[in-house]
Amino acid sequence: MPQKQKVNVKIGDSVTVISGFHKNETGEVLKINRKNGKIIVKGINFKFKHVKPTTENEIGEIKQFEAPLHHSNVKLNLKKVL
């Protein structure tokens, strides 16, 4: 049974991607999956899914969604309070 991983960000936090294709991009945390240590960040890591039509009257479509990132690939943005 996999253990839950400690994730140092919360929903609504501003984070910066520190590695990978989207390096140095910032976004807001939308969802956290502690079971596998992945988070979904708003506006980062878009993927496309091609959906076939299921009936004759329906048409196929391309759905765009934000894929999860591993929590070790992001860092928390700290705002300095004066």
Swiss-Prot record:
Q: Which organism is it from?
A: Phaeodactylum tricornutum (strain CCAP 1055/1)
Superkingdom, taxonomy of origin: Eukaryota
Q: What does this protein do?
A: One of two assembly initiator proteins, it binds directly to the 5'-end of the 23S rRNA, where it nucleates assembly of the 50S subunit.
Subunit comment for this entry?
Part of the 50S ribosomal subunit.
What does the UniProt entry say about where the protein is found? Plastid, Chloroplast
MF terms (GO), sorted A to Z: rRNA binding; structural constituent of ribosome
| Keyword Ligase among UniProt keywords | no
Q: What is its main location?
A: plastid
Q: Do you know which NCBIfam families this protein is assigned to?
A: rplX_bact (TIGR01079)
Protein known as: Large ribosomal subunit protein uL24c
Keywords for the protein's UniProt record, in alphabetical order? Chloroplast, Plastid, Ribonucleoprotein, Ribosomal protein, RNA-binding, rRNA-binding
Q: Which GO terms describe its biological process?
A: translation
Q: What would be one Gene Ontology cellular-component term for the protein? A: ribonucleoprotein complex
